[in-house]
Every structure is written in C-alpha cells, then in structure tokens.
Amino acid sequence: MNSHFASAHTPFYINTKEARYLVLKAVKVCDVRTVECEGSKA
C-alpha cells in the first residue's frame, strides 16, 4: 500500500503497468471532475 504513496510523489517516474493504469485512472477522474465543474458553472 505504501508503494501507492511513493508513486504519488514521482508520477513521471513510473514504468510499471499497474502504476501506469493508476495514473490513467487518476487522469480520468480529474477529467470527470473538470467536466462536472464546467457543467456547474454553466
């Protein structure tokens, strides 16, 4: 579990498939949040 915290400090230093998947998942969440924020403003 600590590996997740370590990867958070170095998001660009990831080469593992699992870590890469986590990053993509995080990016997806951010995109969804952005869309929700834009929708709320509109």
Curated annotation (Swiss-Prot):
InterPro entries assigned: Phosphoprotein_F17
GO-annotated biological processes: viral protein processing
Keyword tags: DNA-binding, Late protein, Phosphoprotein
Disulfide links within the chain: none
Coiled coil: none
Keyword Chaperone applies: no
A GO molecular-function descriptor: DNA binding
Pfam families in alphabetical order: Pox_F17 (PF04767)
Family per record: Belongs to the orthopoxvirus OPG062 family.
Protein known as: Truncated phosphoprotein OPG062
Species this protein is from: Vaccinia virus (strain L-IVP)
Lineage, highest ranks first: Viruses, Varidnaviria, Bamfordvirae, Nucleocytoviricota, Pokkesviricetes
Gene that this sequence comes from: OPG062
